């Protein structure tokens, strides 16, 4: 199947109570904090970054709305994430999630446990590639490496061969219509003892292809698992990235210029398709550079008439959202303006405040500086204004 014809949906199973993960007062394990964020928040963030178009349904317990709502608000995914109430068993919860996606015209669906927060994008890509090659169902799994024993009460009865044995993981991925039909058939037959979705697929005769799982993709089951996950994230190396941007616009006769979103009266204006705010254009490029998301022209082509005369804050706020959707936190924004006139000093504080508002970061993290070009070159001849911008962004850490 061609990639352009594939449309994935995601079911995140999060309705469990997690009795083995500690006392009820600590709350369900999917909402316990690890690395400063809830387990499920890490999980959802990975899928949001992997595919910015696929719908996600979170199957949650009826009592967990107050826990889930603030997490969804922080992720700011809008209508991409919906919720549905789960059933008494995992099997019933998955079926509820699949039914909730029925209006999206999906070709495939990934079903993932919320308490596997370390799922990686490369695994999701491998799964998608197998579907493109024709696989109906895909199961990430690891070969069993421990010696297996069968026991009776407190005695070993026999050693079980581990040849051909695998430990199943999630996400388990399928043709959407096939796995929906399989779950419906299982429910209609009264069979409720399936422990994963691949088992249901096998029961209905669907072929499931194995792909390599990951030792990092652990399921947080016990209280000590959550403690280890928190320790792992707490000792992660910070992924600090720096992006640079440069822009220049010509000056022409006019009544003022807009720089960093602030209009300054002047006997010239900047020439451009939008409002020609050279500072915000440079900073937009700097932010996009931190996550390899192209440049301002890729997102807002100057050939598109809808951006004619547009306020450049639209571009900057979009770039900030792209950064956050990729798991980034903007730490600092620095803009250097190069112009003979107008004077920037009297407006610097207003510019910093505008940047702080547009980026949603503290004022102390926003810097605006200005210099002349000592009457040299096109800037020195007052033919244009240039801007250099640097953005510092911290992305989710890499575990040691």
Swiss-Prot record:
Residues under site feature: Transition state stabilizer: 20, 29, 273, 372
Region feature (2-C-methyl-D-erythritol 2,4-cyclodiphosphate synthase): 241-400
Superkingdom as given in the UniProt entry: Bacteria
UniProt key word Nucleotide-binding: no
Pfam assignment, any one: IspD
Cofactor: a divalent metal cation
PROSITE patterns assigned: ISPD (PS01295), ISPF (PS01350)
Keyword Nucleotidyltransferase: yes
Residues noted as binding a divalent metal cation in the record, renumbered to the chain: 247, 249, 281
MF-aspect GO terms: 2-C-methyl-D-erythritol 2,4-cyclodiphosphate synthase activity; 2-C-methyl-D-erythritol 4-phosphate cytidylyltransferase activity; metal ion binding
The EC number(s) this enzyme carries: 2.7.7.60, 4.6.1.12
Family annotation (InterPro entries): IspD, IspD/F, IspD/TarI, ISPD_synthase_CS, MECDP_synthase, MECDP_synthase_CS, MECDP_synthase_sf, Nucleotide-diphossugar_trans
Pathway: Isoprenoid biosynthesis; isopentenyl diphosphate biosynthesis via DXP pathway; isopentenyl diphosphate from 1-deoxy-D-xylulose 5-phosphate: step 2/6; Isoprenoid biosynthesis; isopentenyl diphosphate biosynthesis via DXP pathway; isopentenyl diphosphate from 1-deoxy-D-xylulose 5-phosphate: step 4/6
SUPFAM superfamilies: IpsF-like, Nucleotide-diphospho-sugar transferases
Record Gene3D superfamilies: 2-C-methyl-D-erythritol 2,4-cyclodiphosphate synthase, Spore Coat Polysaccharide Biosynthesis Protein SpsA, Chain A
Catalysis performed (reactions): 2-C-methyl-D-erythritol 4-phosphate + CTP + H(+) = 4-CDP-2-C-methyl-D-erythritol + diphosphate; 4-CDP-2-C-methyl-D-erythritol 2-phosphate = 2-C-methyl-D-erythritol 2,4-cyclic diphosphate + CMP
Positions of region (2-C-methyl-D-erythritol 4-phosphate cytidylyltransferase): 1-240
GO BP term, example: terpenoid biosynthetic process
Residues involved in 4-CDP-2-C-methyl-D-erythritol 2-phosphate binding: 247-249, 273-274, 295-297, 371-374, 378, 381
Function: Bifunctional enzyme that catalyzes the formation of 4-diphosphocytidyl-2-C-methyl-D-erythritol from CTP and 2-C-methyl-D-erythritol 4-phosphate (MEP) (IspD), and catalyzes the conversion of 4-diphosphocytidyl-2-C-methyl-D-erythritol 2-phosphate (CDP-ME2P) to 2-C-methyl-D-erythritol 2,4-cyclodiphosphate (ME-CPP) with a corresponding release of cytidine 5-monophosphate (CMP) (IspF).
Matches recorded under PANTHER family: 2-C-METHYL-D-ERYTHRITOL 2,4-CYCLODIPHOSPHATE SYNTHASE, CHLOROPLASTIC (PTHR43181:SF1)
Family assignment from sequence similarity: In the N-terminal section; belongs to the IspD/TarI cytidylyltransferase family. IspD subfamily.
Name of the protein: Bifunctional enzyme IspD/IspF
Record gene name: ispDF
């Amino acid at each position: 199947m061609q990639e352009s014809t594939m449309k994935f949906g995601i079911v995140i199973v999060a309705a469990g109570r997690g009795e083995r993960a500690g006392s009820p007062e600590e709350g369900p394990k999917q909402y316990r904090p690890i690395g400063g964020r809830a387990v499920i928040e890490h999980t959802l963030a990975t899928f949001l970054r992997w595919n910015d178009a696929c719908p996600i349904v979170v199957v949650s317990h009826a009592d967990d709305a107050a826990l889930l709502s603030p997490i969804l608000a922080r992720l700011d995914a809008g209508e991409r994430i919906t919720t549905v109430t789960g059933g008494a068993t995992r099997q019933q919860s998955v079926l509820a999630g699949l039914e909730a996606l029925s209006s999206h015209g999906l070709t495939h669906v990934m079903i993932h446990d919320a308490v596997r927060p370390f799922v990686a994008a490369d695994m999701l890509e491998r799964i998608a590639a197998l579907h493109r090659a024709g696989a109906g169902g895909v199961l990430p799994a690891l070969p069993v490496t421990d010696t297996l024993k069968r026991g009776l009460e407190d005695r070993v009865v026999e050693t079980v061969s581990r040849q051909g044995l695998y430990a199943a993981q999630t996400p388990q991925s399928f043709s959407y219509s096939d796995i929906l039909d399989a779950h419906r058939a299982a429910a209609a037959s009264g069979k409720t003892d399936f422990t994963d979705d691949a088992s249901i697929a096998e029961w209905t005769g669907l072929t499931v292809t194995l792909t390599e799982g990951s030792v990092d993709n652990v399921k947080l089951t016990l209280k000590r698992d959550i403690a280890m996950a928190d320790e792992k994230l707490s000792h992660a190396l910070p992924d600090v990235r720096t992006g640079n941007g440069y822009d220049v616009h010509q000056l022409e006769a006019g009544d003022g210029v807009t720089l960093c979103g602030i209009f300054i009266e002047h006997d010239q204006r900047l020439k451009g398709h939008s409002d020609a705010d050279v500072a915000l254009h440079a900073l937009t490029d700097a932010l996009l550079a931190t996550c390899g998301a192209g440049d301002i022209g890729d997102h807002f082509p100057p050939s598109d008439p809808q951006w004619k005369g547009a306020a450049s804050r639209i571009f900057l706020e979009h770039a900030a959202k792209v950064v956050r959707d990729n798991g980034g936190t903007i730490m600092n924004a620095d803009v250097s303006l190069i112009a003979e006139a107008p004077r920037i000093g009297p407006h610097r504080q207003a510019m910093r405040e505008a940047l702080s508002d547009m980026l949603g970061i503290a004022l102390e993290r926003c810097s605006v500086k200005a210099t002349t070009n000592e009457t040299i070159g096109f800037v020195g001849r007052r033919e244009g204004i240039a801007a250099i911008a640097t953005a510092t962004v911290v992305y989710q850490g890499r575990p040691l």
